[in-house]
Amino acid sequence: MFDVNRIRKDFPILEEKIYGKPLVYLDNGATTQRPLRVVEKMTEYYLRYNSNVHRGVHYLSNKCTDANEQARETVREFINAESTDEVIFTRGTTESINLVAYTFGEAFIREGDEIIVTEMEHHANIVPWQMLCERKKAVLKVVPFNDKGELDMEVFRGLLNERVRLVCVAYVSNVLGTVNPVKEMIDAAHALGAYALVDGAQAIQHIPVDVRALDCDFFAFSGHKVYGPTGVGVLYGKRSLLEQMPPWQGGGEMIKEVRFEKTTYNELPFKFEAGTPDFIGVVGLGEALEYVKSIGLQEIAEYEHGLMDYAMRQVREVPGIILYGDAANKSSVISFGIEGIHPFDLGTLLDKMGIAIRTGQLCAEPVMQHY
């Protein structure tokens, strides 16, 4: 049975009072809170086992290395990747997407090629592609969405042609909560010989993800959106593509042999993990995913869906409320405005009541401009 009161006790911050009021935390789209077991696991490694990974033969180094590689296996299982070689640790979704833009972009994008994004993307899935298009003289195409917050799939299909090399789409919109038809878009891209990247930052914590069933070429997400620490994220990539992509950053760990005449690079996934990683953050991410598994992601999804439906019904009854996004397939995010009230004023007022919400452009200005 899904016991929300028991789950709340796993998060000590929810016992806090803000201006004398019980904390109501509704800003999970920006960052989730951490359950106590994640904090305790990271603290254990800082206090008892702290040592660099993949660089020593002593007990502490081996202990941390084993924990990091176990976390990689946890991620692999969580998203159903074929191999841990396809799981690359990064600083977050933004770095994961930039890694693809610089490495896949270097190897696969040529002048005149086209990259497709959607109007509802987070800035992190727009700006790297704009920069790549500037470097390579490629062309960025945009799929619009309607006022319900659903992608115009007819326009998407019309944009597909032999020049398209990459389709980049959010699994779930961070503003609208729309669950996009990513499988359909991936299949359509592949039918023309193009590749597909999925921004999974707002999906990984809400709905089961199976990268092999999706058949996506790349999948990116952040630890701090799924009850893990900040500063750690994941890039999944198909091995066949990762092997063809050049390293992004140079330094320790990503090398096999260094000579002044020539350097050879490490095997996957380490080719893309230059320098000392946030190895204790990785341990925290692994523990966060184990926490989610202990509850059950399907159970979480079902509970959240009921909660969202209830909240949407209640919000519609409030005079002056303007809802943004009412897609038929929607998950976990409700965005709204109130007539005659500036978002920052509303956010400040709610803060005084102990309620934390996100206000502003939500790192998705094109979405805000749509409305």
Language-model features: where?
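Pyridoxal 5′-phosphate
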Residues: M1-Y371
